[in-house]
């Protein structure tokens, strides 16, 4: 089968299997896909992207917004550029198809240009690696593509995640004469594989009676979390990007509540998703006197301390509230109200220009999906924002890296534009620090090229402020901290935005930021919002109920 025919058959199979977006990165070995895309072989949205690393994180953002993306790259280092996004997708359980063009086997290990062993480059981070040899017939090819898509979405029983389809192409890499004449293609029969629904275990069997229970939702939390809370009376505590906020019913200030005196009385915790932000939460889940029930459909489940009493795939809500939990829930509500007042007083006594003040301003002034930098911004929202109810919130906490945050935000904006009802509509607001933005500055080109409905709030604390909230802030001298952890950048952000065709605004106070966010703008916009480092606030808010 000619290479372009092979590429066309793969694209038609991907389209038939529900892949929504194809991101194509230019190259010679991957060129058959370009010709096939130009001929209309893919029925979804196809987009050329210059940078493979940006394309990978653009796919991560699309997956976070509910799309099923595929990234096509050429052979060699182009494949390795996808590695950071593949790691994030793997740990965040996001479906992503990495379609990697390759040279035929006889050209590997003999000194041929741009040839390496790339078929297992992603190792254990890919759910599967499907190898397609050159000239493979389309009937068998469609079956292999079906298996790849099934593995990516976690069907029938696995965890969703990235899958590599490594395609060997022989010359010629251009359309044959028959292809150029538009000869009719044979239909591709793709096999759809359904995801198996887990068995629901009775709440009474898994959790039992409790007098002081909590439900804690981390990234990838079950959509049933709110139902469990309503039916059991257990207060629902949630990280910003767990997905639980979209359904409402969340008790804010989770870190303050758990770290306070009330946290000592907790006897049962139901954990759903992967909570990673809070040391008080981790300490609670490690306590031997607390019964921990983990709800997770897939291995490996989240149990960092090894303290889980029970792990279940899914859980039915209880038929009645649990024990004496009503009085406990009232105590938690009172503690939450007290925490809110004290946090407000604490911030009112400060400068009003910290990352935490900025987070509260963004939460008030915007109403669409949020993308939060995985370092300081997501922690600021977790600590002190009183409500994110009804909001779709995303953060690359799979590996908690700062790489690709702009590209991820563009992906969320594109995916949200395709499904406004699912994500609540509205302009996407991304909040990130200066190092995070600088690390992915080239992805501003993606934002401009896609005309993304996106506000990028640059919370500029003059370097890596996150480390000051950790033990390194006390262990290092000021000069040593700035040299090895801060890494402040001298960047003209207005010029940077202009260079990439992104509009620019500056907000020197949270009030100015709120005003700008309330003003609509076409296309992407960068809002430079300088903030002061205030590491002391993080500990003070965490301990505000002690």
Residue ranges and their predicted role:
Residues 7-11, 15, 28-37, 332-425:
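Active-site diphosphate/adenylate-binding microenvironment
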Residues 120, 157-198, 516-546:
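Glycine/aspartate-rich loop-and-adjacent alpha/beta segment that forms the canonical ThDP
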Residues 9-19, 61-67, 149-159, 202-212, ...:
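Glycine-rich phosphate/diphosphate-binding loops that line cofactor/substrate pockets in enzymes
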Residues 46, 88-89, 95-99, 106-119, ...:
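Thiamine diphosphate
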């Amino acid at each position: 089968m000619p290479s372009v025919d092979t590429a066309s058959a793969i694209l038609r199979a991907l389209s038939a299997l529900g892949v929504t977006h194809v991101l194509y990165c230019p190259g010679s070995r991957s060129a058959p896909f370009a010709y096939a895309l130009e001929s209309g072989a893919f029925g979804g949205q196809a987009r050329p992207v210059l940078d493979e690393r940006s394309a990978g994180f653009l796919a991560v953002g699309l997956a976070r917004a509910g799309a099923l993306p595929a990234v096509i790259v050429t052979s060699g280092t182009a494949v390795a550029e996808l590695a950071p996004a593949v790691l994030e997708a793997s740990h965040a359980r996001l479906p992503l198809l990495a379609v990697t063009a390759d040279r035929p086997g006889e050209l590997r290990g003999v000194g041929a240009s741009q040839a390496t062993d790339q078929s297992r480059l992603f190792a254990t981070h890919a759910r599967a690696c499907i190898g397609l040899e050159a000239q493979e017939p389309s009937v068998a090819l469609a079956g292999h593509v079906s298996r790849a898509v099934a593995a990516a979405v976690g069907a029938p029983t696995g965890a969703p995640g990235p899958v590599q389809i490594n395609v060997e192409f022989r010359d010629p890499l251009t359309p044959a004469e028959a292809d150029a004449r538009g000869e009719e293609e044979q239909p591709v029969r793709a096999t759809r594989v359904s995801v198996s629904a887990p068995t629901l275990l009775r709440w009474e069997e898994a959790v039992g009676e409790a007098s002081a229970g909590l439900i804690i939702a981390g990234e990838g939390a079950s959509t049933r979390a709110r139902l469990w809370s309503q039916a059991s009376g257990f207060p629902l505590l949630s990280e910003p990007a767990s997905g639980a906020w979209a359904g409402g019913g969340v008790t804010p200030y989770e870190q303050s509540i758990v770290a306070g005196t009330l946290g000592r009385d907790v006897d049962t915790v139901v954990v759903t998703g992967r909570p990673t932000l809070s040391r008080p939460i981790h300490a609670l889940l490690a306590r031997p006197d607390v019964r921990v029930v983990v709800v997770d459909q897939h291995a490996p489940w989240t149990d960092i301390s090894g303290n889980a009493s029970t792990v279940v795939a899914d859980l039915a809500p209880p038929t009645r509230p649990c024990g004496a939990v009503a009085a406990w829930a009232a105590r938690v509500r009172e503690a939450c109200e007290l925490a809110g007042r004290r946090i407000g007083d604490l911030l009112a006594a400060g400068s009003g220009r910290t990352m935490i003040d900025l987070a509260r301003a963004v939460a008030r002034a915007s109403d669409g999906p949020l993308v939060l930098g995985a370092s300081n911004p997501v922690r600021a929202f977790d600590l002190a924002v009183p409500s994110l109810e009804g909001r779709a919130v995303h953060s690359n906490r799979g590996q908690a890296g700062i790489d690709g945050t702009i590209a991820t935000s563009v992906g969320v904006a594109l995916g949200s534009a395709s499904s406004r009802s699912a994500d609540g509509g509205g302009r996407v607001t991304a909040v990130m620090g200066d190092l995070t933005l600088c690390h992915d500055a080239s992805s501003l080109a993606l934002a401009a090229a896609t005309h993304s409905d996106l506000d990028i709030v640059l919370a500029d604390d003059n370097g890596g402020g996150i480390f000051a909230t950790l033990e390194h802030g006390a262990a290092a001298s000021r000069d040593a901290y700035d040299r090895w952890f801060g890494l402040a950048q001298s960047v003209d952000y207005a010029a940077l935005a202009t260079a990439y065709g992104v509009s620019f605004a500056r907000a020197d106070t949270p009030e100015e930021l709120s005003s700008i966010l309330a003003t609509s703008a076409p296309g992407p916009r960068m809002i430079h919002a300088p903030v002061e480092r205030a590491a002391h606030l993080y500990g003070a808010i965490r301990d505000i109920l002690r």
